Curated annotation (Swiss-Prot):
It comes from Caenorhabditis briggsae. GO terms for cellular component: axon; cytoplasm. This is F-box/WD repeat-containing protein sel-10. It is found in: Cell projection, Axon; Cytoplasm. Residues 123-169 form the F-box domain. WD repeats lie at residues 255-295, 297-335, 338-375, 378-415, 418-457, 463-502, 503-541. Probable substrate recognition component of SCF (SKP1-CUL-F-box protein) E3 ubiquitin-protein ligase complex, which mediates the ubiquitination and subsequent proteasomal degradation of target proteins. Regulates synapse elimination in early development in the motor neuron HSNL. Cell autonomous negative regulator of lin-12/Notch-mediated signaling, with respect to lin-12 activity in cell fate decisions and tumorigenesis. May target the intracellular domains of lin-12/Notch proteins for ubiquitin-dependent degradation. Involved in sex determination by promoting female development. Its main location: other. CDD domains: WD40. Probable component of the SCF(sel-10) E3 ubiquitin-protein ligase complex which includes skr-1 and F-box domain-containing protein sel-10 as a substrate recognition component. Interacts with fem-1, fem-2, and fem-3. Interacts with the intracellular domain of glp-1 and sel-12. Interacts with lin-12. Interacts with skr-1. Interacts with zyg-1.
Length: 589
């Protein structure tokens, strides 16, 4: 059911870093596999042929020692006669003969029989196989099993350290992890206690450094033996940090005074926040300091985006303009004019921007040149949400419809009709031509617009009792958060609700899916909760405001694989406007 190719770890088991076995081979030796030559090399010129690996295993040695006591003597005619008779027996008769022999033997003979028989059930199959086949087998194991494999023998340990084995796990679980950051400067300094805000405990960095040094002296540098293994084990440590461990650090970013943070994005080391105070702020995540304040709008900023290349920041405002800023220094490059009402939403692919407005239109722009490309007209009311993949534009409006557009011709390809109230949220997955739309009519509709016109609806998901504020889709699993205070987990092909996650006391404002079954949600109740959507259970509260329930709320969430940004404030001045950063990162083992 679950759209996952990753490896599930038993939460109750020992962690992989704790299970790292004491190496049975030279610590300085690095083993690589050349599959064409079927041999190992240790980086120093020496090589280990695969045939040699498989010919001297401990189990093979045991088999040799367990041979018959008479194997070096001349053949015994009486024994040879019995063996010949035995071969002529049927299988059933042979089994009966075995049983009678055991019954007629004394305990000493039975012990010798056992020593001869047992090795046949303990064959070292990895040593008997070509190296590339052994690697293929190990690529199907999880990290805990690979740790156990490494403790069996030198041969098995060498195979378990091969880069390809851990690269396979890394691809299934933790891809594209950025290198660890040393977040100890600026706003990250001495922020373990945040007045009025409850967050997870922080690690004792001194204890961490001592623990790492002890492991390094005992086991040697894992990264040097297998970079992919080190990266994967770091990924598992990060996941455990999210689940239950103390966090690496926290930072408070104060800005926008008592105004609402309306939008927030992360790109590498940049965090961008937009506010109804007419400004945007560009923050450095590494030190938690403001790099630039973007002034220029004459109305509140309601939507913003960072370009995929990271060079541009784009913002839309109630002043009816779109502005393009240079991220490096905050310089205003272009002011895009044309909309006649609030710019409410935007989506970007490369340097092509699509904006949606309360003037019922969408506009396509080139942000490098600042030129207007075309206008998409067809909605009969305000455009509330938009998605864009570079070719296809999907928009949702207050006219209860979802429209599919060709971005370059400007033609409306399809109008999806079915909602009975305003469309507030959209998801678009271009590979499958799937659109998910959430409406004030409380329903979520899943469409496949590659189907014939009129047959696009593939699922009608009912159960929420208010508007859907956020959705994320992976495979057949859709997660939605709603103003009714509940999170629901759906199977879009079955059209069923798998889990209802209850715990928030007020409207849910934002949702972030980290993969591997972890979802974080924020709420007007002043909390951020982490859920396991596979089991349908609450893992823990990541943030809890003392002012929650009295006006303090979490407006927005934004995340990377190692960090969570929470936009915090209130509508009645009970909570200071700020962004809290929580660092769940881990160093290489």
């Amino acid at each position: 059911m679950w759209p996952r190719n990753d490896v599930q770890m038993d939460e109750g088991s020992m962690t992989p870093e704790d299970q790292e076995p004491e190496p049975a081979i030279d610590q300085d030796m690095e083993f690589d596999v050349n599959l064409e030559e079927n041999s190992y090399s240790n980086g120093s010129g020496s090589s280990y042929n695969a045939d040699k690996l498989s010919s001297s295993s401990p189990l093979q040695h045991k088999l040799d020692l367990s041979a018959s006591p008479t194997q070096n003597n001349e053949a015994n005619p009486r024994v040879e006669h019995l063996v010949a008779l035995f071969k002529d027996l049927t299988v059933a008769e042979q089994m009966e003969a075995f049983a009678r022999l055991v019954q007629e033997s004394n305990m000493s003979n039975i012990r010798q029989m056992r020593a001869i028989i047992e090795p046949h059930f303990q064959k070292d199959f990895l040593s008997c196989l070509p190296v590339e086949i052994g690697i293929k087998i190990l690529q199907n194991l999880n990290s805990t099993d690979l740790m156990k494999v490494a403790q069996v023998s030198k041969n098995w340990k060498m195979l378990s350290e091969v880069e390809k084995v851990w690269k396979s796990l890394e691809d299934r679980g933790f891809k594209n992890l950025l290198e660890p950051s040393d977040r100890t400067r600026g706003a990250w300094e001495a922020t373990a206690v945040i007045p009025g805000v409850n967050i997870p405990d922080h690690v004792n960095q001194c204890e961490i450094n001592i623990h790492r040094l002890v492991k390094l002296l005992k086991y040697g540098p894992i990264y040097e033996r297998s970079a992919d293994k080190s990266r994967y084990l770091r990924g598992e440590k990060i996941e455990k940090n999210w689940h239950s461990r103390p966090i690496m650090g926290s930072a408070i970013l104060r800005g926008h005074e008592e105004h609402v943070i309306t939008c927030m994005q992360i790109h590498n080391d940049l965090l961008v926040t937009g506010s109804d105070d007419n400004t945007l702020k560009v923050w450095s995540i590494d030190d938690g300091e403001v790099k630039h304040t973007l002034n220029g709008h004459s109305g509140g900023v309601w939507t913003s985006q960072i370009s995929q290349c990271g060079r541009y920041i784009v913002s839309g405002s109630t002043d009816r303009t779109v502005k393009v800023w240079r991220a490096e220094d905050g310089f205003l490059l272009h002011t895009l004019q044309g909309h006649t009402s609030t710019v409410r939403c935007m989506a970007m692919a490369n340097t092509t921007l699509v904006t949606g407005s309360r003037d019922c239109t969408l506009r396509v722009w080139d942000i490098e040149t600042g030129l207007h490309v075309r206008t998409l007209q067809g909605h009969q009311a305000a455009v509330r949400c938009v998605q864009f993949d570079g070719n296809i534009v999907v928009s949702g409006g207050y006219d209860f419809t979802v429209k599919i557009w060709d971005a370059f011709s400007g033609k409306c390809l399809r109008t999806l009709i079915g909602h009975s109230n305003r469309v507030y949220s959209l998801l678009y997955e271009s590979e499958r031509s799937i659109v998910c739309s959430g409406s004030l009519d409380t329903s979520i509709r899943v469409w496949d617009f590659s189907r014939p016109e009129g047959q696009e609806l593939i699922a009608f998901l009912s159960g929420h009792t208010s508007l859907t504020s956020g959705m994320q889709l992976r495979g057949n699993i859709l997660v939605s958060c709603n103003a009714d205070s509940h999170v629901r987990v759906w199977d879009i092909y079955e059209g069923t609700c798998i889990h209802i996650l209850s715990g928030h006391r007020s409207a849910i404002t934002s949702l972030q899916w980290f993969g591997r079954g972890l979802v974080a949600t924020s709420s007007d109740d002043g909390s951020v909760k982490l859920w396991d959507i596979e089991r349908g259970v609450l893992i823990r509260d990541l943030v809890s405001l003392n002012s929650g329930g009295n006006g303090g709320c979490i407006w927005r969430l934004c995340s990377t694989q190692t960090m969570l940004a929470c936009a915090i404030g209130s509508r009645n001045n009970t909570e200071e406007t700020k962004v809290i950063l929580l660092d769940f990162d881990a160093n290489h083992p």
